[in-house]
Amino acid sequence: MDRFHIQGPTTLKGEVVISGAKNSALPILFATLLTSEPVEIYNVPKLKDIDTAIKLLNQLGAQVEHQNIIVFSDTSKVHACCAPYDLVKSIRASIWILGPLVARFGYGKVWFPGGCSIGKRLVDLHIKGLKKLGAKIILGEEYVIASVNGRLQGAHIVMDKISVGATVTIMSAATLARGITIIDNAAREPEVIDTANFLIMLGTNIIGAGSNRIIIEGTQKLKGGRYCIIPDRIETGTFLVAAAISRSHVICLRSNPNILKCVLRKLRESGADINTGKDWISLNMHGRRPKAIKICTKPYPGFPTDMQAQFTLLNVVAIGVGKVIETIFENRFMHVPELIRMGARVQILNNTIICHGVDTLIGTRVVSTDLRASVSLVLAGCIAEGLTIIDQVNHVDRGYDNIERKLQNMGAHIQRITDK
């Protein structure tokens, strides 16, 4: 398994080009199963999870190819409706394949997904939604089967809790259902809107994506077409934090400030000077150390849980005492013990992290445990004194396109070591 060797401290600064949003690309890739016509998807990031999703689709009989930032997908010859275990176990987003399979083919079998180890990440909301649409569900210990005779049937679905994943599953399946589907208490994330816009491009009618009520008018057949994925707001936020903890400056190109308002507000609160344009964001600390802040993770448009670990690091090296409250996932503080090994002064009280800011971190050997925790350790290694070794960096590869090259361009001394 690969590891990073990072020699610090370095000042991270300069320009970075933001990749397409992983959390849009994955559901959109799986949603290509809804149509038998060719689809071209632009601005698709080069990620381990994307590669796995493409392998999964190809094993079902699809013809999917990733060239640079473009994916060409043709699912007209899909001959299997069971997602193979060896691929599903490594990517939790694989549950998104179930809705399109049952909607178009009347049958889908998916092994319970793997990926990150941050909490339970239950799929019950996906299953409840498909049941409401008329799917018959069989639950095994490690798999779920969804089937329907004929077409799914539109329904009024009130989500028990806000869930991006379940909103996408229901919305995708409903595109081929008979009649109208209404989703209340729907997730409002930009990636939900992006997926909805892709489905609209395929020929379905969706109203209200981005609000807590989404209305989908099902159709019998969808067409093909071309679509461009939005920039990754979490990658954008990560590089903004990289400059903030370096007390330096960065310009994030091909980004969208309109989908990052809460993060930008908190960065300004920490002392950052931020300017924005239509497709760029600049941050400048003017050599100042950031000020400690309070954040509380909430569903969009609140503070994103996927930025929690990065802002924990910001508070670790900030002036004063900062507080981080995690309300979305349990067990998402696995980066904290590793930061403490690097010299952080941090306490965990239930779902809250209290950070007493320190001026300097010290390089050491740490282990990455999940995607966002891992990237916080990478950034910590860049500003720490001495050598930091980060094991199990495959987690970072799941969500960040070419991160070492982008950090090297910003001044980091980071090297990937591959064990033979």
Curated annotation (Swiss-Prot):
Leader sequence segment: none
Pathway the protein contributes to: Cell wall biogenesis; peptidoglycan biosynthesis
Keywords: Cell cycle, Cell division, Cell shape, Cell wall biogenesis/degradation, Cytoplasm, Peptidoglycan synthesis, Pyruvate, Transferase
Residues that, per the record, bind UDP-N-acetyl-alpha-D-glucosamine: R92, D306, I328
PTM annotation (2-(S-cysteinyl)pyruvic acid O-phosphothioketal): residues: C116
Keyword Cell division attached: yes
Catalytic center residues: C116 (proton donor)
EC number: 2.5.1.7
Binding site for phosphoenolpyruvate: K22, N23
Pfam families associated with the record: EPSP_synthase
GO molecular function: UDP-N-acetylglucosamine 1-carboxyvinyltransferase activity
EC supergroup of this enzyme: transferase
GO CC term, one of those recorded: cytoplasm
InterPro entries, alphabetized: Enolpyruvate_Tfrase_dom, Enolpyruvate_Tfrase_sf, MurA_subfamily, RNA3'P_cycl/enolpyr_Trfase_a/b, UDP_GlcNAc_COvinyl_MurA
Compartments where located: Cytoplasm
Domain of life: Bacteria
SUPFAM superfamilies the record matches: EPT/RTPC-like
Family recorded in the similarity comment: Belongs to the EPSP synthase family. MurA subfamily.
Family annotation (NCBIfam families): murA (TIGR01072), PRK09369.1 (NF006873)
Function (record text): Cell wall formation. Adds enolpyruvyl to UDP-N-acetylglucosamine.
This protein's name: UDP-N-acetylglucosamine 1-carboxyvinyltransferase
Annotated organism of origin: Blochmanniella floridana
Gene behind the chain: murA
